[in-house]
Amino acid sequence: MPSPLSLCRYLPRELSPSVDSRSCSIPLVAPRKAGKLFLGTTPPRAPGLPRRLAWFSIDWEQVCLMHRLGSGGFGSVYKATYHGVPVAIKQVNKCTKDLRASQRSFWAELNIARLRHDNIVRVVAASTRTPEDSNSLGTIIMEFGGNVTLHQVIYGATRSPEPLSCREQLSLGKCLKYSLDVVNGLLFLHSQSILHLDLKPANILISEQDVCKISDFGCSQKLQDLRCRQSPHHIGGTYTHQAPEILKGEIATPKADIYSFGITLWQMTTREVPYSGEPQYVQYAVVAYNLRPSLTGAVFTASLTRKTLQNIIQNCWEARALQRPGAELLQRDLKAFRGALG
């Protein structure tokens, strides 16, 4: 998640992105003064641990949970402080119905653990250490930058005491600004051979500096891992934003994220929901009948310039992945369109 502070300036060097895979037993979360929650203390690191593993840990005494921000199928996210710096902490649940899916989600979140980009949520640290008796596979500490997602801005459902005006917040110029933020993030991810595979407005955070950052990497995959698989592999995600080839169980490519971006851009410009109806019927129609959201609104047809926006979206959600633009070409097209608008 985006952060108004540069964590690098405030956190010790050993707290750079990390994974602590050691087993442990730490106290249950216990209430303390001022209504805050502390995770308690943990046993000291075993003597003789190699120096190269010095950053494979979370300093639990410095973790202060404040309140829950939200929850989903694979876990809960809390606002917290870490060494006094605002962060978000995600705890991945042990899903009793599908433990492997929970495990995949936890480790997938760490695909970006060592990456740095302005439009990507930064992982500060991670650990498989969990409080005793908790239903958690592990903990991930991420940078924090507020409570607002692109979904909330589009549909006007924020936690702010003064609701955002969608029309003020999402003018066409603002849509293009946010779109370029997201595409810049995708371009970086794809250059690192990482696919997000669940890109949608709810997984795009907007910082206090009005910068979009891609978050929630629980469905992400590394390209080399996908290429090594000899049989189709189920990929999680949101059916309304999944490319036809993903719905058919084919191997994912970076073009799957481009398809998801096309749906997201359509949502930004129309402020409508992509589909209605039962999921299985929508999925079938997307694959068999090339079903897509409507592009007949005035926002796409009012002028030749607006037709360009329609073409950009159509190119993103082409049925055949090879016909979709890559992130670099998409970035160029969006910049050209923004320039044409003046």
Swiss-Prot record:
Family from the record: Belongs to the protein kinase superfamily. Ser/Thr protein kinase family.
Top-tier EC class: transferase
Alphabetically ordered keywords of this record: ATP-binding, Kinase, Nucleotide-binding, Oncogene, Serine/threonine-protein kinase, Transferase
Name of this protein: Serine/threonine-protein kinase-transforming protein mos
Keyword presence, Metal-binding: no
Catalytic residues identified in the record: 198 (proton acceptor)
Listed Pfam families: Pkinase (PF00069)
Annotated ATP binding sites: 69-77, 90
Catalytic activity from the UniProt record: L-seryl-[protein] + ATP = O-phospho-L-seryl-[protein] + ADP + H(+); L-threonyl-[protein] + ATP = O-phospho-L-threonyl-[protein] + ADP + H(+)
Single Gene Ontology MF annotation: protein serine kinase activity
Native organism taxonomy: Viruses, Riboviria, Pararnavirae, Artverviricota, Revtraviricetes
EC number annotated for this UniProt entry: 2.7.11.1
Coiled coil, from the record: none
Gene: V-MOS
SUPFAM superfamilies on file: Protein kinase-like (PK-like)
Domain Protein kinase: 63-338
InterPro entries, per database record: Kinase-like_dom_sf, Prot_kinase_dom, Protein_kinase_ATP_BS, Ser/Thr_kinase_AS, Ser/Thr_Kinases-Pseudokinases
